[in-house]
A protein has these predicted regions:
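The feature captures the beta-strand-to-loop junction immediately N-terminal to the Walker
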Residues: 37-39
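Helix-to-loop junction immediately C-terminal to a conserved catalytic motif
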Residues: 52
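Conserved ABC ATPase "signature" region
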Residues: 102-119, 172
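Conserved ABC ATPase signature
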Residues: 124-128, 132
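Hydrophobic anchor residue at the start of the ABC signature
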Residues: 138
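Conserved catalytic motifs of ABC-family nucleotide-binding domains
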Residues: 145
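Catalytic Walker B motif of ABC-type/P-loop ATPase nucleotide-binding domains
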Residues: 149-153
Length: 252
């Protein structure tokens, strides 16, 4: 069995006196897209920050595979306001041992993969719509060719038709790059359109409420299947279906 790229083992975390996560055990397998769902404040973003190395568990153990390159994207795009879209992405590659011209070309390519091109690349963040800023931030994360992509509500600022196109596009890019992704979403349909597996967290302090391995590949799921799976996830999240949580999520 291939070792997971990321593991949370009985992880807990609190902000001050407020417990946010409790007893979280998740294995993130290589090559899969895993979505985290749950109510606001249940610790989804905290798990992303831990995976990115920005927070340390209060208790329990977090393990990353040796040499694992991570790239986070948070709800706030955090773009540099004095740089245009192209140079925002290219700047994220400055630590790479490649010539400046190659950095710019790689940035251009990955921006095009997220649906931005031409005059849009010369626009500054304040000139871009919220959805465009999200796509620049996504391109910046993808550009560094991470092993593990950490996305916190990456499609939230997009209108529904564009979000649906981006689900397929981002999944294709992740697969082409042989990457792994951990994605936070509040939208069950979004999870079904992009993920291989969904982990549902309870209200704070977040605990594993349920785990669902989704059948087939997202691109083969019909509209009726998407609606049925999303309804099941929402029912699990709302406590309307009995939950039989796996002793360790992701471990068979």
């Amino acid at each position: 069995m291939t070792a997971p790229i990321l593991s949370f083992d009985n992880v807990a975390f609190r902000y001050g006196d407020m417990p946010v996560l409790d007893g979280i055990s998740i294995d993130i397998p290589r090559g899969a897209i895993t979505c985290l769902m749950g109510p606001s404040g249940c610790g989804k973003s905290t798990l992303i920050a831990m995976a990115a190395g920005l927070l340390t568990p209060e208790s329990g153990v977090l393990r990353r595979a040796d040499g694992c390159r991570t790239a986070p994207m948070f709800q706030d795009p955090l773009l540099l306001p004095w740089r245009d879209a192209l140079s925002n992405v290219a700047f994220g590659l400055k630590a790479e041992p490649i010539p400046a011209a190659e950095r710019v070309e790689r940035a251009r390519t990955v921006l095009e993969e997220t649906g931005l091109s031409g005059a849009e690349l010369a626009k500054f963040p304040h000139q871009l719509s919220g959805g465009m800023r999200q796509r620049v931030a996504l391109a910046r994360a993808l550009a560094v060719a991470p092993d593990l992509l950490l996305l916190d509500e990456p499609f939230r600022a997009l209108d529904p038709p564009l979000a649906r196109r981006m689900h397929a596009r981002v999944r294709r890019v992740i697969e082409e790059r042989h990457a792994t992704a951990l994605i936070v979403t509040h939208d069950a349909r979004e999870a079904v359109r992009i993920a291989d597996r969904v982990v549902l967290l309870s209200a704070a302090p977040g605990r594993i409420r349920a785990f669902r391995e989704l059948p087939d590949r997202p691109e083969t799921r019909t509209a009726a299947e998407i609606a049925e799976l999303a309804e099941e996830l929402d029912a699990l999240a709302d406590g309307e279906l009995p939950v039989r949580p796996h002793p360790r999520v992701g471990q068979k």
